[in-house]
Amino acid sequence: MIRSDVERTLDFYVRMCSLSVTAESLAGLGLLLAGGGICPATGERLLSPDTVRVVKTIMLTCGMYDGSGTFAVQVGIPSKSGVGGGILSVVDRRMGIGIFGPALDGKGNSVAGERVLRHLSQQLHLHIFDTDSQTD
């Protein structure tokens, strides 16, 4: 339940939906989350460990709209898609991934982005529950 002014909340939401990002900036944000909230360039803590854990959990369970459950089983990488075709993904302690593909499926997720992430997950053993994912 939202407990703030509706107009202010909608204004904030529209502003967040209107941000211009690149695949590189999405990957950079993913890398920040993959590193536990510590900026890889400066070593400065930007996000608390609790915040990082909550964000990655929500990404895994809800980040791909109504396709989140299937995506979690098949790909297993915490990800957040946007209706502009971007996907931000986090591989804990390893990497951030940023992808753009403008064609969307019926659930609002990038068709090409999902395919790329599925391929990377399988080939590099990136699934969060893959026993090989903990080895380098």
How would you name each of these model-derived features?
Residues 1-41:
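Active-site-proximal helix/loop microenvironment
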Residues 34-136:
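Structured C-terminal helix/loop/strand segments within mature extracytoplasmic catalytic/sensor domains
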